[in-house]
Amino acid sequence: MKRVNSCVKDEEHVLEELETEGERQLKSLLQHQLDTSVSIEECVSKKKSFAPGTMYKPFGKEAAGTMTLSQFQTLHEKDQETASLRELGLNETEILIWKSHVSGEKRTKLRATPEAIQKRLEDIKERISERQRILCLPQRFSKSKQLTRREMEIEKSLFQGTDRHSFLKALYYQDEPPKKNKGDPMNNLEHFYRETIMKKRLEEFQLLRGESFACHSLVSAASVSGSGTAEKPSLLQDKGKQAAQGKGPRLHVAKLIDFPTEQYWTGPKTLKQPIEFIPEDEIQRNRLSEEEIRNIPMFSSYNPGEPNKVLYLKNLSPRVKERDLISLFARFQEKKGPPIQFRMMTGRMRGQAFLTFPNKDIAWQALHQINGYKLYGKILVIEFAKSKKQQSAVQRSSLITSAPDGRTEINGS
């Protein structure tokens, strides 16, 4: 009886080799080729289409004799043109009609009516256009398998970092999504249906609350400068007022696209889903005081700063979205006041946000009620944003310190 070694680590187990779609397709083709249990009826039942046969006329008699190089090239080009017309299934009469039509020559030997000749020319044009369409189609193996976009992504990920045989690529291809006509009204059917359903749900939610939800129209800015002031505040406030005066209850939140060199303003987007506000008693149960925040080593030097209307939020969880901040701070929105501006940061400043309130009193109230709240497992730390003068003063104080003998020392130089 064999002894089983229970001390073998998981890393020592041999991983099962993954079979890709190309290898699976190649194996099925091989099994189909080696299968000998095939009857004559099955072979006959398979439909096979072949290209129609054409007449081959060797190029030699016309080129016999002495001629210049330019004459030979012209003769060879005409012969190639005639051969391509024969591949379309045209007979000699139709080839003659087409050549005379292209060259503009009138042949007296053709005794057909102009209507019949025009009909034949239209038929030839259709054959030529159909051949061009077929030639433009992608050339694929007859047994190649069509994969969806997700299957193609999985297939590419399996080959990541390894060499792939080139012939395996011919065994599958990605399906192309159908092209939508821009002028087709059916393209907007899904958007119209979604907007109608969400509007009805918001109206029901508004009736249940018993208050106008339009007063909570909140606008978040797209980017923040180093001083903590919003870019284009007048533009945001105007759009927020227009949204508040509208008929439908909507929440406007701007979206930020992070680029390596600069940031672009994309305008406000509409949140049509109802947002549930977090109750105040739940916030009080799940928040830390300022002393408890200072007991955390990371925030031992926590200081709220000088009160102003801009709050700086940090230590945000990556799961926090705009709607989460709205559920916390929308309670401080005044019915007839300007909208609160939310600015979610991305890139290197991910996990931070700036909130601009109508005045510093509301900002102070929001800080003392929400600061220290545990949101998605992380403590939300709030401070008053610093102006440019305060930031420069803090930098100077951190670089310049006074020695006991009155000399001035510069740290970090």
From Swiss-Prot:
Coiled coil: none annotated. GO terms for molecular function: RNA binding. SUPFAM superfamilies: RNA-binding domain, RBD. Keywords: RNA-binding. CDD domains: RRM2_RBM40_like (cd12239). It holds the Pfam family RRM_1. This is RNA-binding protein 41. It comes from Mus musculus (Mouse).
